[in-house]
């Protein structure tokens, strides 16, 4: 108040990543070999306000140690009709492993049955981001209905695969060849979507390792997919005390939790629930360490060189 600056005895930073900062995403992803700027086509699954302001302040203005690849993120394939922000979980398309995914050229590009969906759903946004136009199409038939969480928008429905390709705006000839080749390659054993079953393909690339069944039972459904970013992995380097590190030295009273330090745990890929686990575990660690640091002091000391302003900023942010 009245311009008075209150120095904190300790501070916990928990201000999230930069997934809503479209300029930063664009800078990180750059321009691809097709002349596209992939990040321009990303959708943000959550708030429009996680812009990484405090993260950038620590990294660029105060020399905090960083960890993680700025292009790595929890990135899900979501319905292309989802809003730019705040679409949430109901826009996620969870039928990928029950069918095939093609790009806008009508071609498959990855093993849809590589592993259980909770271990693979968060790589599909990145896979779609690498495709022309940053768009893909999840294709299923009526056998898949009832086996996945239905999204908020219904799929495009057609009685034939040719009609489906036309409705999705895909090249009919290529799409038909892709589906015919996949169907012919399916070696159906005992289908069980709850296990890594023996239904696979042979003689087609990319292979489908599990849950491969011909897409031959109408009606057929298609969902256009875009990359949906949940949170980014670039963060502040820390250790098991959750202390922010400067020049590889831990700060005595500046700590971090949640997405701001996710890169210490997540390099690439994801398993369902890890994000909440990071927030829960390191939130408790950081809070405990910050309380202990504050108790050791009768008044707020200076942080290590270059970190004083960062602490004040964090304290002001935390008390806002």
Model-found features: residue ranges?
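Short acidic/polar mixed-charge low-complexity motifs
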Residues: 2-4, 107
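Glycine-rich loop(s) and the adjacent beta-strand/alpha-helix scaffold that form part
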Residues: 4-78, 276, 285
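Mobile, glycine/GP-rich and aromatic-enriched active-site lid/loop segments adjacent to catalytic centers
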Residues: 23, 45-51, 56-270
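N-terminal low-complexity, intrinsically disordered patches enriched in charged
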Residues: 25-26, 115, 272, 282, ...
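Internal hydrophobic alpha-helix adjacent to the cofactor/substrate pocket in enzyme cavities
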Residues: 57-65, 176, 278-300
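Active-site-proximal substrate-binding core of FAD-dependent oxidoreductases
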Residues: 66-80, 288-320
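Conserved mid-domain beta->alpha element of the FAD-binding
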Residues: 268-278
């Amino acid at each position: 108040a009245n311009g008075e600056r209150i120095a904190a005895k300790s501070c916990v930073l928990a201000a999230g990543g930069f997934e809503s900062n479209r300029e930063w995403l664009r800078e990180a992803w750059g321009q691809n070999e097709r002349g596209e700027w992939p990040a321009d086509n990303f959708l943000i699954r959550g708030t429009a306000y996680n812009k990484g302001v405090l993260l950038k302040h620590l990294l660029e203005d105060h020399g905090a140690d960083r960890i993680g690849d700025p292009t790595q993120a929890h990135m899900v394939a979501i319905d292309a009709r989802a809003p730019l922000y705040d679409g949430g979980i109901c826009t996620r398309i969870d039928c990928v492993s029950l069918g095939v995914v093609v790009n806008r050229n009508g071609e498959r590009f990855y093993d849809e049955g590589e592993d259980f969906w909770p271990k693979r759903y968060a790589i599909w946004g990145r896979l779609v981001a690498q495709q022309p136009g940053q768009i893909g199409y999840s294709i299923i038939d009526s056998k898949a209905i009832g086996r996945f969480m239905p999204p908020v928008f219904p799929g495009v429905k057609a009685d034939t695969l040719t009609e489906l390709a036309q409705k999705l705006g895909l090249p009919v000839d290529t799409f038909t060849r892709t589906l015919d080749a996949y169907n012919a390659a399916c070696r159906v054993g005992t289908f069980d979507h709850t296990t890594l079953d023996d239904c696979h393909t042979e003689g087609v690339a990319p292979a489908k390792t599990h849950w491969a069944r011909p897409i031959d039972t109408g009606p057929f459904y298609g969902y256009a997919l875009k990359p949906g970013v949940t949170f980014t992995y670039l963060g502040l380097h820390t250790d098991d005390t959750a202390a922010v590190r400067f020049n590889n030295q831990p700060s005595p009273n500046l700590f971090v939790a949640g997405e701001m330090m996710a890169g210490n745990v997540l390099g690439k890929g994801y398993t369902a629930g890890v994000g909440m686990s990071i927030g829960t575990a390191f939130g408790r660690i950081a809070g405990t360490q910050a309380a202990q640091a504050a108790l050791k002091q009768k008044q707020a000391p200076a942080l290590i060189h270059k970190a004083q302003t960062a602490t004040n900023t964090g304290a002001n942010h935390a008390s806002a």
